[in-house]
Every structure is written in C-alpha cells, then in structure tokens.
C-alpha cells in the first residue's frame, strides 16, 4: 500500500488499507475493510471492521463501530458501542452497548451501560447514565441524564430528564422537562410538562401543560392539565383537576378534583379537596377550606377557618378569619368581619369593620371600627366608629361616630358626625328605636330647598292639654308671602 503513518497490530488489522494515512488498528480484524479512510483509531477485536472510506472515527472495545462504513467523527468506547452504526456521523458512545443499534442517527451522545441502546435514526440525543434513553428509536433532541432516565422513550422528541428514573416510562410524550429523582417517572404520552424536584409529577400519565417545582409537587397528578405547583408538596394530592395554581409549601396539598384554584402562600388552601375557583393569597389563607367555592382571600389568615362557605371576598390580614360556612360576604381591611361565622350577605370595608359580627345578615359598614360590635341584621354604617356599639337591627348611620352610642335600638336614621350621641338633638340614642337625628349640637342652621312637610293627624295624638293662647295671640299674627332669593 501507499498509506503512511499507519499502525496495525493484530490479525487482519487494516488488512484492506490502500492509500489511507494516520490510522491506528489494534486487535484482530480492527479496521480490516478500511481502504481510504484516514485518522481512524480502532482498539479491540472487530472494531471498525466494516469501515471503508470514513475518517476521524475512534472505536475502543470489542465490536465497537463494527458496522460503520462511511460515518465520520464518531467516538465509541465500550464493547458493542455504536455497533450498528453505518453512515451516521458525530456520535459519541461511552459504555457497553451504548448506541449499539444506531444506524443513521447523528449528533447523539450516550454515556453509560446501554445508554441509547435501541436508537436507530434518532438524532441530537444526549443520554448519560445506565439505560438512559435505552428504548429510544427515532426520537430526537432528547436529554436523559441519570440511570433509566427516559428509559422507555421511543419516538418522542425534545424531552429533558435529569435524575434517576426521571421520565422513566415516557414513550411518545414530547416537550417534557423533568429534573429530580423519579420526576415525571410515570408519564407515558403527555406533553409539555415541567417537573423539578424529587418525584415531582411522579404519577402523571397523560396530563399535559403542567408545571411542578418542588419535592412531591403535583406528585399524584394523573390526567390533570394546566396546573402549576411551586413548593414542597404543593398540589400533592391532585389527580384529575386542571387549571390550578399553587405557590408555597403545602399549598393546595389535599386538592384532588377541585379546578381553577389559585393558592399563593404557605398552607394556602391546604385542606381544599373538590372546591373550585378559589383564590387564596397569603400565609394560611383559606387554609381549612374543603368544598367552599368561588372565594377570594388575600391576606395572612384571611378566611382561614372557612370550610364550606362560598362566594366570599376577604382582603386584609385576618379578614373573615372565623368564617366557616357563611356565603356572600365581603370584607376589606385587617380584621374586617373577623368574628363572622355563619352570617351572610355582609359587607365590611375598613380595619375592624364589623369585626364583632358572628351571625348577622345583610349588614354594610364602611370605615374604621364601623359596626364593630354588631350582631344584628340589615344595619348600614358609613364613617369611623359609626354604629360601633349597636347590636340592634335596621339602623342607618352616616358620619364619623354617628350612632356610636346606639346599643340595642333599631330602625334609627342618624346623619352627620356624632349624630345620636350625647349633646345631639334629642340627646343620645342608646336603646331607642324609630328615631331620626340630623347632626350634633354644633349644628346652628338647617336648610332645605322646599318646605318641611310634617304629618299631623288628631287620630295619631293623645293627652291633649289646653293652651292659654287665645284670640289676642291670633290677632297679633302678621302673615306674609315671600319668594326665595338665594344668596
């Protein structure tokens, strides 16, 4: 031959070489068929035995790259590594049987016993670990790092699995990412899932578009879709429910079939099982809720005791904190409606607003401490400390401290700052009912566009007493007419 700088050790090694240079063949029949292929290294019996014109291949191990003919720039280290490769290039196989059935798949990297073992035409795959991606045939652009990672994947592409048995059972599911031991290990055909953490999304089979970050997050999910779980054990018990978001350790941890829930904060919506469309933001928000639906809770301990109550809104620390089964309440402010348990259709806006109400119905309060002692029904208070001590019902007070001294009275109307307190017209109202008070003792004038009309009917009066005002009083009257001339 005319080839230069070749090394051949072993029977038949480089036996057919003609003009090729810089080849090294060590072992019986190593590079035996090579004619013009250059810069190849074959160490081991039958290594690169079929190579003819391909160059820059490295094969170390019995039967490594044994079927290669024209594939270039391949590296095979280990018995039977890349054994079936024929024309594919740019593959790296390290380990017994790694990439051993690959024929035309290119740009693959396999490190570990039987890594990418069944690959035939799949390209740009990376498998690191014993049996990683070992069932892959035509799947492309997969990354499997860890023993048995993506172990049963066949034709699926664009998956990433990092960790022992991550995505182990995946067959045709694509675009999944699993980081952590046993993450997404039961996934078969589902796509577009992301799992980060030990056993995250571990039971998922066909559920898609899920994101799980944290140990055991979404661990038991099987067919639920479009869930997001961030934090240890977040959405741990979820099985078939979809469209849930849980951010925080143990948030939504017992949810099984409830859908459309959002929980942000440690143990938020912790006990929720089947309820849907709840929003909980804050430490322990809606923590004990089980079947109550359509609640919104923002603030530490807000709606923390709620179990079955629905359609409640609590915004503020400890807002509606004692509520259990009541529905259709709105509480905005720290401790607003804090003592409410079964009262419904209440609205409280302001710190400590209606904070003493436990079973009241249809009350509305806006302002600091408004209606704070209330346990009655259908009261309305607007202003700081308005109706703050009342336990009666159907009172209306507008103004700071209006009706402040009303305790058990009902059906009163008090308008203006301090109306109904000591010093206001008629004195303080405490237990009185059916009274109207306008303003306090500082009011000096009262204006109205039209004349007052006050009902007067003898049938509604009693205890008549004669007056000593006779005809002389009547004669002294000087009636006039007038027109308004507003200043």
Per-segment meaning from a language model:
Residues 1-457:
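Glycine- and small/polar-enriched repetitive beta-structure motifs of secreted/surface proteins
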Residues 433-487:
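C-terminal intramolecular chaperone/autoprocessing and neck/assembly modules of extracellular spikes
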